[in-house]
Swiss-Prot record:
Residues annotated as transmembrane: none
Organism: Saccharomyces cerevisiae (strain ATCC 204508 / S288c)
Phenotypic consequence of gene deletion: Decreases haze protective activity in white wine.
Protein location: Secreted
Major location category of this protein: secreted
An example Gene Ontology CC term for this record: fungal-type cell wall
UniProt protein name: Secreted protein CSS1
Residue ranges of every copy of the Methyl-accepting transducer domain listed in the record: 26-253
The family this protein is said to belong to: Belongs to the SRP1/TIP1 family.
A Pfam family it matches: Hyphal_reg_CWP
Signal peptide extent: 1-23
Keyword annotations of the record: Glycoprotein, Secreted, Signal
Gene: CSS1
Role played: Secreted protein that may be involved in cell wall organization and biosynthesis.
Regulation: induction: Expression is induced in both high and low pH environments.
Length: 995
């Protein structure tokens, strides 16, 4: 008896010391009072093989006993905190652990396992074949060999154990002295501990057995088992699939005398308790900032508005109300549902795996847009991820930027309407469905929409749905075999050549917009194109063509081409281009059959894309919604259209057309009816086109069927009202930077009589300008003169001449363009230019030049001979050698039928001296002609001739040349004598040659 008392006192001291230590460490611990007077024991196992507990026995004088005990089930491997077990972590400090593979647990831990090898410091452990136990710790394991520090022993056949001993065995039948008992057949136990085993049917609160005189024993224990059916306690509970339960809240049970033992629950972000739910056990917990209290509710909320999730697996239905921050992995298991209610911010910075359902909901009528951020390692969806907050008063911001983004389920975001929600995401792999409503999507997850490498692109083998004005801006490469469905939205491709394998399907009205950055080698398949749903290029379109055989529509912009496989059955003559606005910049819309898109929904350009169209290629189709062409001066901004009738329409619109018959003629007119609502409550505009000839009618009323005209006889218009209309001309403007095509729209002239007035027109000529830097081609566009009579007036024209300019640096070709003279008679000859080629030679060599001069104006019907030039080649020789030059002179003006130009005579002279012989050429002007057929011209220059002089001395013979001036030739006879003299000189030269 004395020994038992000593053992009891030792156990009591150890318990009190443990309580003091726990109280100092877990400063936020609180206590929950209990009326039970018992020790606290928890012990269970799925197979009822081992039960462990560090229990002290009480007597009549026992006052305080602390027992920090927890128990886990067959699949539990580790727990973080002194609450229920988990299957994913290892814990220290007041933690119970039980698993088939548990090897080590430290500090105040109860352990049970078939392979437990080592446990230290106040650990209760049990097994069927314990061989040696020492100190106040019970140990069990099939191979347990040694445990130190006050341990009591138990075995499979123990029937009675006394003192501070905990016992557990598969066949345990009787345990005495404040010991908790559990076995495979346990049916009923009471006390402040939750307990369960494989066949447990009912367990309630604080389980322990104590002597009749025991006064106070308290303990808080969490317990789990593989087949728990019903458990209630102020403790979190988990089953075989539990991954973790943690919280900084403390749970405690105290006796009437004030003794308590608390098991704080803590995590790294100490604030909230959360449990992973099993079928019928507690599925959600309500927690406060500092303490966790167990309730059997189905929601988890926080008093300060923030819920911190630890590593959690959700296996049932769980609702989290308020802001949620998860810094560890969260898994929504298949068949489970996690509802995030009324939070304005959600952050998942670790893995988020949705195999069941994750719902973002609002219960209030008004609320701000949600900020939802996923930035962990993996975002994996095989179930459903759904967010519904279309009534948000500010923009919803969703950011999906994990390292790996994989969706094979369904992600659906219906975001704020008042200001389009924004979605940013990193490259993804999608084999399921993305559905977006009221959203602006920026792929690439970077601001500024920077292009990504091809290896960093997305893969879409599923569907992407764009509805209610959603715009998907694609910067990163997208490959795969998926589809993008434009229900009522826009798809904006910055790099169309990297958008491969995808099919764009128009299921409503919207816009497929393409930046002219790169030619797409393969046509983009487009299904459902009608013209109401449009294709736009965000730069000037210089050409548009359609191949009826292949069904490919090709738009050309400069040297780039963008092709779309829209299918066969279209008429190439019915395509046109209209200018408008998309994403805050000018765009050119590819229209078909005069139909203009009506629902390219607009949005603020700061956050996404806006679309509207103005201008036209034919007669100016009218405007509806935020996409249309101007007519009657109508203009579109956002979703407001106006016409010259002063009517205006706001909001989304539908297009109606009407044909008016009057005065034996049929005309289609353009009208806008303001604030007209159809049977479905939609505001609409009735629009058609009017030609520039301005057919007129009086519109008295409009309804859903069209516009109506009041007439006196039912067929004739009672009153006419002229409307403004517009013509559009395409002008190509060229400068040093290249050529750009612009569209000029002018107002048609007012009708002043029955005669149709000719509209203004433009004349375009191409001019090639050359300078030292090269040649550039420019296009000059001028307005044609207004018609003043029925006589056709020739418009201004330009004459272009090519001039080759040569200097010492070489020859360059220039083009000179001048304005032709105005027409003053029926036929007016324009100015012309005469071009002569001149070869100029100097000491540096010869250069060819071209001289262009203007022809004289005509003064009569007689053709005037233009000025001409005579070119002769002159070889100049001196001591340095001979150079050939070309002399060009202007021919005399013609005063009679024939005018003989001046001529030149050239003679070759060989000069010899002591240094040798040099050949020179002397050119002189020929004598005047004195015959009747020639007009005497200016006196010719003096003519020189050369003769040979032979000198002989003792050194040999030398040849010298003496040059003499001869009188002017007065007849052809003199010229003959000169010729003979030159012949003689040549002969003497031959005779003088040394033999």
């Amino acid at each position: 008896m004395f020994n038992r008392l000593n053992k009891f006192q030792a156990a009591l001291a150890l318990a009190l010391y443990s309580q003091s230590a726990l109280g100092q460490y877990y400063s936020n611990s609180t206590s929950i009072s209990s009326n039970s007077s018992s020790t606290s024991v928890v012990s269970s196992s799925s197979g009822s093989v081992s039960i462990s507990s560090s229990i002290a026995e009480t007597s009549s004088s026992a006052t305080d006993i602390l027992s920090s005990i927890t128990q886990s089930a067959s699949s539990t491997s580790g727990v973080s905190s002194s609450v229920g077990p988990s299957s994913s972590s290892v814990v220290s400090s007041s933690v119970s652990q039980s698993s088939s593979s548990v090897s080590d647990v430290s500090s105040s831990v109860s352990q049970s396992s078939s392979s437990a090898s080592d446990v230290s410091s106040s650990v209760s452990q049990s097994a069927s074949s314990t061989s040696d136990v020492s100190s106040s710790v019970s140990q069990s394991s099939s191979s347990a060999s040694d445990v130190s520090s006050s341990v009591s022993q138990s075995s499979s056949s123990a029937s009675d154990v006394s003192s501070s001993v905990s016992q557990s065995a598969s066949s345990a039948s009787d345990v005495s002295s404040s010991v908790s008992q559990s076995a495979s057949s346990t049916s009923d136990v009471s006390s402040s501990v939750s307990q369960s085993s494989s066949s447990a049917s009912d367990v309630s609160s604080s389980v322990s057995q104590s002597s009749s005189s025991a006064s106070d024993v308290s303990s808080s224990v969490s317990q789990s088992a593989s087949s728990t059916s019903d458990v209630s306690s102020s403790v979190s509970q988990s089953a075989s699939s539990t991954s973790g339960v943690s919280s900084s809240g403390s749970q405690s049970v105290s006796s009437a005398s004030g003794s308590s033992s608390s098991f704080p629950q803590s995590t790294s972000s100490a604030s909230t308790a959360s449990g992973s739910a099993t079928s019928n056990s507690l599925s959600s917990i309500t927690s406060s900032a500092s303490s966790a209290s167990a309730t059997a509710s189905n929601s988890l909320s926080s008093s300060d508005g923030t819920i911190y999730l630890p590593t959690t697996t959700i296996s049932g239905d769980l609702t989290l109300t308020g802001k949620v921050i998860a810094t560890e992995g969260v898994v929504v298991a298949a068949g489970a549902k996690l509802t995030l209610l009324d939070g304005d911010k959600y952050s998942f910075s670790a893995d988020l795996k949705v195999y069941g359902d994750l719902l973002v909901k609002k219960s209030k009528e008004t609320y701000p847009g949600t900020e939802f951020d996923i930035s962990g390692e993996n975002f994996d969806v095989t179930g459903n991820f759904n967010a519904e907050e279309s009534a948000a008063t500010s923009a919803s911001i969703y950011s999906f930027t994990p390292s790996s983004f994989d969706n094979s389920g369904d992600i659906s975001l219906s975001l704020s309407k008042s200001k389009k929600g924004e979605v940013t995401f990193s490259p993804y792999s999608n084999s399921g469905a993305f559905s977006f409503s009221n959203a602006i999507l920026n792929g690439g997850s970077v601001s500024g929409l920077q292009r990504r490498d091809d290896t960093e692109g997305s893969v879409n083998n599923g569907e992407i749905n764009l509805d209610n004005g959603s715009t998907y801006v694609i910067v990163e490469p997208v490959s795969g075999k998926g589809t993008v469905n434009i229900i009522s939205g826009n798809l904006y491709l910055h790099y169309p050549d990297t958008f491969t394998g995808q099919t764009v399907v128009f299921k409503g009205e919207g816009v497929l917009a393409v930046d002219p950055t790169e030619t797409n080698a393969t046509p983009i398949p487009v299904v459902g194109y009608t013209g109401k749903n449009q294709i736009a290029i965000t730069a000037d379109i210089t050409a548009l063509s359609y191949d009826g055989t292949t069904g490919v529509l090709t738009a050309t912009q400069g040297n780039r081409q963008f092709s779309f496989a829209i299918g066969t059955g279209f008429s190439s003559s019915d395509f046109s281009v209209s200018e408008g606005i998309f994403a805050g910049a000018y765009a050119y819309y590819l229209n078909y059959n005069g139909v203009v898109a009506t629902s390219a929904a607009s949005s603020s350009t700061a956050s996404g894309a806006s679309a509207s169209v103005t201008g036209s290629t034919s007669f100016g189709a009218s405007v509806t919604g935020s996409t249309a062409s101007t007519s009657f001066g109508a203009s579109v901004t956002g979703s407001t259209a106006s016409t010259s009738f002063g009517a205006s329409v706001t909001g989304s619109t539908s297009v109606y057309t009407t044909t008016l018959d009057y005065v034996n003629a049929t005309s289609t007119v353009v009208v806008s009816c303001s604030e007209t609502t159809d049977s479905n409550g939609n505001v609409y505009t009735i629009t058609t086109t009017v030609p520039c000839s301005s057919t007129t009618a009086t519109i008295t009323s409009c309804d859903e069927t069209g516009c109506h005209v009041s007439t006196s006889t039912g067929a004739v218009v009672t009153e006419t009202v002229s409307s403004k209309s517009y013509t559009t001309a395409t002008v190509t403007h060229c400068d040093d930077n290249g050529c750009n095509t612009k569209t000029v729209t002018s107002e048609c002239s007012k009708e002043t009589s029955a005669t149709t007035a000719s509209p203004k027109s433009y004349t375009t000529v191409t001019v090639t300008h050359c300078d030292d830097n090269g040649c550039n081609t420019k296009t000059v566009t001028s307005e044609a003169p207004e018609a003043t009579t029925t006589t056709t007036v020739s418009s201004q024209s330009y004459t272009t001449a090519t001039v080759t300019h040569c200097d010492d640096n070489g020859c360059k070709t220039k083009t000179v363009t001048s304005e032709a003279p105005e027409a003053t008679t029926t036929t007016v000859s324009p100015k012309t230019y005469t071009t002569a080629t001149v070869t100029q030679c100097d000491d540096n060599g010869c250069s060819t030049k071209t001289v262009t001069s203007e022809c004289p104006e005509e003064t009569s019907a007689t053709t005037t001979s233009p000025k001409s030039y005579t070119t002769v080649t002159v070889t100049h020789c001196d001591d340095n050698g001979c150079n050939t030059k070309t002399v060009t002179s202007e021919a005399p003006e013609a005063t009679t039928t024939t005018v003989s130009p001046k001529t030149y005579t050239t003679a070759t002279v060989t000069q010899c001296d002591d240094n040798g012989c040099s050949t020179k050429t002397v050119t002189s002007e020929a004598p005047k002609e004195t015959s009747e057929t020639s007009e005497t011209s200016a006196a010719p220059k003096d003519i020189h001739y050369c003769h040979w002089l032979l000198n002989g001395d003792d050194n040999g013979c030398n040849v010298k040349i003496i040059t003499s001036k001869i009188p002017e030739a007065t007849s052809t006879v003199t010229q003959l004598v000169l010729l003979q003299s030159h012949t003689l000189l040549s002969l003497l030269r031959v005779l003088k040659q040394p033999h």
